[in-house]
């Protein structure tokens, strides 16, 4: 009778009995099997206690309860194995999810880099197209090298791209001196020993007058006279006020002594 009551309880319990619904989760099935084991164990213990107190032998009912208990225990063990397998699968799923997240971040990074590369390539293609248009336009309106050389000669012969600070409209001078002007300048005269004996030394009359000779005089208004004075040698800075050596007083005394000696020698000879 106890076995019948236990069977009825199993049928009433959701998910209980041998034919538990397969649509339930493994956790629910494990809890149901555990409850069945608990109920069967209590009934078996109660039956054993009653039979011991009353000293009645009802081995048939005890065997039925024991068989049910063993059967439910087998189901419980199978469910435990299934739960372990599902746990392993769940762990693998978590690992795969992390790997998927990592791959997803890598894909997003690559997508970002590809977008940047696409922008760079689009800019490069646009610039290349513009250059091709310029090249095609230059080919259509090509200019010979002779015309370019003539134009360069015209620029070098007339004016340049910049002018001196003192340049005013109508000034025919070039912004920089020509080769002829450079040769006739101060540096050119210093390097030319055949021009008025100038080879690092200036004429005495020019130094005595405190001015530069006409050859070395500045040819442009932006050349300062101070610059010309600074170009003079330092050993001539205080020699301009000195008298020539022939007009010294000591030289005059020497001349008088020599004349006296000559007159005395002439008188002795007489």
Swiss-Prot record:
Modified residues (N-acetylalanine): 2
GO cellular component: core mediator complex; mediator complex; nucleoplasm
Keywords associated with the record: Acetylation, Activator, Coiled coil, Nucleus, Phosphoprotein, Transcription, Transcription regulation
Modified residues (Phosphoserine): 32
Compartments, record wording: Nucleus
InterPro entries registered for this protein in UniProt: Mediator_Med4 (IPR019258)
Stretches of the chain forming a coiled coil according to its record: 24-48, 90-131
Keyword Transcription: yes
UniProt subunit comment: Component of the Mediator complex, which is composed of MED1, MED4, MED6, MED7, MED8, MED9, MED10, MED11, MED12, MED13, MED13L, MED14, MED15, MED16, MED17, MED18, MED19, MED20, MED21, MED22, MED23, MED24, MED25, MED26, MED27, MED29, MED30, MED31, CCNC, CDK8 and CDC2L6/CDK11. The MED12, MED13, CCNC and CDK8 subunits form a distinct module termed the CDK8 module. Mediator containing the CDK8 module is less active than Mediator lacking this module in supporting transcriptional activation.
Function: Component of the Mediator complex, a coactivator involved in the regulated transcription of nearly all RNA polymerase II-dependent genes. Mediator functions as a bridge to convey information from gene-specific regulatory proteins to the basal RNA polymerase II transcription machinery. Mediator is recruited to promoters by direct interactions with regulatory proteins and serves as a scaffold for the assembly of a functional preinitiation complex with RNA polymerase II and the general transcription factors.
Name by which UniProt lists this protein: Mediator of RNA polymerase II transcription subunit 4
Organism: Bos taurus (Bovine)
């Amino acid at each position: 009778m106890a076995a019948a009551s236990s069977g009825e309880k199993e049928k009433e319990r959701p998910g209980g009995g041998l034919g538990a619904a397969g649509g339930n989760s493994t956790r629910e099935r494990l809890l149901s099997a555990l409850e069945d084991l608990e109920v069967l164990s209590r009934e078996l213990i109660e039956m054993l206690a009653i039979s011991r107190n009353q000293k009645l032998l009802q081995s048939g009912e005890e065997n039925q309860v024991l068989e049910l208990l063993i059967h439910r225990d087998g189901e419980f063990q199978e469910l435990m194995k299934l739960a372990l397998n599902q746990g392993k699968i769940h762990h693998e799923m978590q690992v795969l999810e992390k790997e998927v997240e990592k791959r997803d971040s890598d894909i997003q990074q690559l997508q970002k880099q590809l977008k940047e590369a696409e922008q760079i390539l689009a800019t490069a293609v646009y610039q290349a197209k513009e250059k091709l248009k310029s090249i095609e336009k230059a080919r259509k309106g090509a200019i010979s090298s002779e015309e370019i050389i003539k134009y360069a000669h015209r620029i070098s012969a007339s004016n340049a791209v910049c002018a001196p600070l003192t340049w005013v409209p109508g000034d025919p001078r070039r912004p920089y001196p020509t080769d002829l002007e450079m040769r006739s300048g101060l540096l050119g005269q210093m390097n030319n020993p055949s021009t008025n004996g100038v080879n690092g030394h200036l004429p005495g009359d020019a130094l005595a007058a405190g001015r530069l000779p006409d050859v070395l005089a500045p040819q442009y208004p932006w050349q300062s006279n101070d610059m010309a004075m600074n170009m003079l040698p330092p050993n001539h800075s205080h020699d301009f006020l000195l008298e020539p050596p022939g007009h010294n007083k000591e030289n005059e005394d020497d001349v008088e002594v020599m004349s006296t000696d000559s007159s005395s020698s002439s008188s002795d000879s007489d």
